[in-house]
């Protein structure tokens, strides 16, 4: 593999910045941001650059520890770059099961782009796919350090666990993505579709274990209340990406972040989705917290 030379002696650090809007578009979901962060960390290591993530300009920063702006970044003049880049060249939808996903053209494009930047610290948004899927502990520690709940959020997490009757690491997560149209557009969800997912779950769960249901559909969660082993949390949630967020001032951001943290304290994650791609929200939460993860495709 022949790569172009990185010759920008001025550039010292690249930062993946998660906020709602950029000069050329709006952000996708949190999972996309986490995926791109793993990708950029690998690029930074390859080129000998420092790497950092920054969520200080996103509404969820209100609920996180030590979320401060980074010197040298103009948050009003950031762009989206290489969004969803480095996808499998053969069009495979399950390539994350492999250990590598190396695309020299993608890496060279980034090198060429970075060579043009006249700054020491470069902030931008990237959701590209990593080249390697064996993620280093140092990278996981770095990302986790920026996603720590503050005192208010920790109290909210503890209160919620007590309300549910669950303890940290004492439950599994079943994360069900019925489709963003049910979360964002509040489309009515078909009862036959609900029962189809419910039957899959009934064949999945063990009678001696506890499961917390996380989903983009509160309607679906209500239908799972009748299953003894399943616990549900019915609260207003919000898509965290700027492209689909309806209200950045509502409690929805806080509650979606709550679901992320509850998932991070689980002992297993089952991710079910109508999409052909794996949910980054649950997948990367599992990776960051060393939680066993299994993906199940839902066919409508």
Model-identified regions with their sequence ranges:
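N-terminal regions that are enriched for targeting/export leaders
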Residues: 1-33
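Short, solvent-exposed loop/turn segments at secondary-structure junctions
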Residues: 56-61, 128-130, 177-181, 216-220, ...
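Gly/Pro- and small hydrophobic-enriched strand-loop and loop-to-helix capping segments
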Residues: 45-57, 273, 286-300
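Histidine-anchored nucleotide/phosphate-binding helix
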Residues: 33-46, 194-202
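Secretory-pathway luminal glycosyltransferase catalytic domains
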Residues: 2-15, 62-208
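Donor-binding and catalytic core of enzymes assembling or modifying cell-surface/extracellular glycoconjugates
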Residues: 209-293
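Short, flexible/disordered intra-domain loops and linkers
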Residues: 23-28, 182-191, 242-253, 276-277
